[in-house]
Amino acid sequence: MEPGQPREPQEPREPGPGAETAAAPVWEEAKIFYDNLAPKKKPKSPKPQNAVTIAVSSRALFRMDEEQQIYTEQGVEEYVRYQLEHENEPFSPGPAFPFVKALEAVNRRLRELYPDSEDVFDIVLMTNNHAQVGVRLINSINHYDLFIERFCMTGGNSPICYLKAYHTNLYLSADAEKVREAIDEGIAAATIFSPSRDVVVSQSQLRVAFDGDAVLFSDESERIVKAHGLDRFFEHEKAHENKPLAQGPLKGFLEALGRLQKKFYSKGLRLECPIRTYLVTARSAASSGARALKTLRSWGLETDEALFLAGAPKGPLLEKIRPHIFFDDQMFHVAGAQEMGTVAAHVPYGVAQTPRRTAPAKQAPSAQ
């Protein structure tokens, strides 16, 4: 062809063999890349009456020790000012944080199996914080990618009166007095404590451990021990082995967990269920264990594991279980669990509690 002479038009070539096959992975990779860039759609909040509602205070969900000190020593105005100045700094995770993350992991599994079901966990932030502090709380929740859409910020007033309106199945707080108020209102509640050291817990299975007497069951048997001693207690339990114990404050929460477990069982996933429950009791198996198990059976409930310690410390066993939370009515069991790295929660119910004074000692208010 001479220089400057126009080229003759050429017909398009047919793609060679294997060209489509070679291009397919490229397009698949590009699709995955752009899908990941798209904002992920958040799940829809369930109706409160259909969900298992867990209400947590801000000091249970996040560590707010420094802020609480400012509130106590310098007052509410300085506290709010400090929160506003630091509202873009997320709080550190608090003792209830791993528990909440585990609840959300269960929700993801439930939504995979039952996309339209509202029978899931619904987490509510229940706090007496001022609404101005809400921005920092929201920023912290978004920072950790938590799905908490329901807030109740009462501006210094007790939030306990709102718990029933939110259909609360369990209330966790760092404020012991508010927990006692909730228990008195018939709501399952516990004061949550940070462990003395951090322990890695399961990211895929929610593990919840319960004491028996005065937690799942009433304090009937503990009253016998306190009044008449262990020998009389063993006689009493043997004589009443086939009489179910009355329910304790957290029976309803175990029932709610069992309801969600059955949704996995019905899909043939009993062994792969992302919820596992434990009964961890100081009872002896041979002398007083049968009544505890028969009581659960009479309620149509069960725990995945039942551990009878016959008075031995609970901390070492809990260290092996690594639950996200352990509920007990006696503070020395709570302290023993803390020492072994377990997040423990005190249920202030029953005869084991320190008698209240008629004129309680004045406590500094807390910013929950």
Swiss-Prot record:
Active site positions: 211
Reported pH dependence: Optimum pH is 7.0.
UniProt-listed GO biological process terms: adenosine metabolic process; allantoin metabolic process; AMP catabolic process; dAMP catabolic process; dGMP catabolic process; IMP catabolic process; nucleoside metabolic process
GO CC entries: cytoplasm; cytosol
Domain of life (superkingdom): Eukaryota
Catalytic activity as recorded in UniProt: a ribonucleoside 5'-phosphate + H2O = a ribonucleoside + phosphate; a 2'-deoxyribonucleoside 5'-phosphate + H2O = a 2'-deoxyribonucleoside + phosphate; IMP + H2O = inosine + phosphate; AMP + H2O = adenosine + phosphate
Keyword Secreted in record: no
Cell compartment(s), UniProt: Cytoplasm
Reported regulation of activity: Activated by ADP.
Record has Nucleotide-binding as a keyword: yes
UniProtKB keywords: Cytoplasm, Hydrolase, Magnesium, Nucleotide metabolism, Nucleotide-binding
GO MF annotation, one: IMP 5'-nucleotidase activity
InterPro entries assigned: 5-nucleotidase
Cofactor(s), by name: Mg(2+)
Tissue note: Highly expressed in skeletal muscle. Detected at intermediate levels in heart, brain, kidney and pancreas.
Enzyme Commission code: 3.1.3.5, 3.1.3.89, 3.1.3.99
Region (Disordered): 1-22
Record's function text: Catalyzes the hydrolysis of ribonucleotide and deoxyribonucleotide monophosphates, releasing inorganic phosphate and the corresponding nucleoside. AMP is the major substrate but can also hydrolyze dCMP and IMP.
Protein family membership: Belongs to the 5'-nucleotidase type 3 family.
Protein name: Cytosolic 5'-nucleotidase 1A
Lineage, broadest ranks: Eukaryota, Metazoa, Chordata, Craniata, Vertebrata
